Amino acid sequence: MPVDFNGYWKMLSNENFEEYLRALDVNVALRKIANLLKPDKEIVQDGDHMIIRTLSTFRNYIMDFQVGKEFEEDLTGIDDRKCMTTVSWDGDKLQCVQKGEKEGRGWTQWIEGDELHLEMRAEGVICKQVFKKVH
């Protein structure tokens, strides 16, 4: 049985986010705005089908996928690229590989207690975010 990621999560910390955005070639103005945001995550999980909504006052991003199946991810509004994305289970963690222009791009997501941990990677840069479950 997979881990239950269902819930609404509020950001607690966001380490190295601006460097991560720089590695994705996000322009300086957008990096500065994005770095000020504290987005929430709303996750709806039905077995291996997931919808992850990243919600902020500036922009929302919705990722709708089936674990284990590759899909084309449109990152318009983030770094305006498309990539082929696969999310898979690695024990109790979700591992995402995003194949495209940027080397080593992807993320890992897991739960510790009532906290959601998200580690995003691109071009050797790692950003660590932590969210607390609110419901």
Swiss-Prot record:
Subcellular location: Cytoplasm; Lipid droplet
Keyword DNA-binding: no
GO molecular function: all-trans-retinol binding; retinal binding; retinoid binding
Biological process according to GO: lipid homeostasis; lipid storage; regulation of granulocyte differentiation; response to vitamin A; retinoic acid biosynthetic process; retinoic acid metabolic process; retinoid metabolic process; retinol metabolic process
Pfam families xref list: Lipocalin
Amino-acid biosynthesis listed as a keyword: no
Binding site for all-trans-retinol: 41, 63, 109
InterPro entries (UniProt xref): Calycin (IPR012674), CRBP1 (IPR031264), Fatty_acid-bd (IPR000463), ILBP (IPR031259), Lipocln_cytosolic_FA-bd_dom (IPR000566)
Family: Belongs to the calycin superfamily. Fatty-acid binding protein (FABP) family.
Comment, domains: Forms a beta-barrel structure that accommodates hydrophobic ligands in its interior.
Protein name (record): Retinol-binding protein 1
Name of the coding gene: Rbp1
